[in-house]
Amino acid sequence: EGMVAEPAALAQEIKELLLEARTRKRYVVTALSNLAVILRPIQVPKMPLKEMEEAVRWEAERYIPFPIDEVVLDFAPLTPLSEVQEGEQVQVMVAAARQEAVAGVLEALRGAGLVPVVLDVKPFAGLYPLEARLAEEPDRVFLVLDIGAESTSLVLLRGDKPLAVRALKQLKVLLVDGD
């Protein structure tokens, strides 16, 4: 779930699409499927970045259902670090994906001759077109809903700051015309 089953086959499809589009662009920004990523806000003390990375990794172990050594882990502060005093708690959004999920996507892209420059997570990638609008009202609460074929993501924000994220797997969606 959320993994590229056949990277070589996907690479071939991407190559064909690129030929059809007659593009020479090779740099790509993409996002991992909702089903491949665990997103969780956690709190850690503000400290030098290297130490904070270790603290996030240690704290994230409590929430990840597989060995921490098998994941690619990243985080982003939800409050600018310049606004937090050293030693105070800072809330960060943690993203964790199994290494094989990341490797499958990267293998397919590189196999198609592309150069991945950003690998984001789908719930946040969908917010980019809304960034300016969300930032205009920093105290307003927004719910962004992305309904997809394989999953739905909900992102609750105050202004442009995420408060909570949920990814829901679609069990089965039937679209019926008429009755």
Report residues per predicted region:
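Solvent-exposed loop and beta-edge segments used for protein-protein assembly and interaction
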Residues: 22, 86, 146-148
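Short glycine-rich, Thr/Ser-proximal phosphate-binding strand/loop in the N-terminal lobe
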Residues: 1-4, 43-47, 160-179
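Gly/Thr-rich phosphate-binding beta-strand-loop-beta motif of the actin/hexokinase/Hsp70
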Residues: 1, 26-31, 131-164
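Short amphipathic alpha-helices and their capping/turn segments at secondary-structure boundaries
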Residues: 14-23
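Glycine-rich beta-alpha junction loops
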Residues: 123, 149, 169-172
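Active-site neighborhood for divalent-cation/phosphate handling
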Residues: 4-5, 9, 13, 27-134
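Structured loop/turn residues at beta-strand edges in well-structured enzyme cores
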Residues: 23, 114, 163
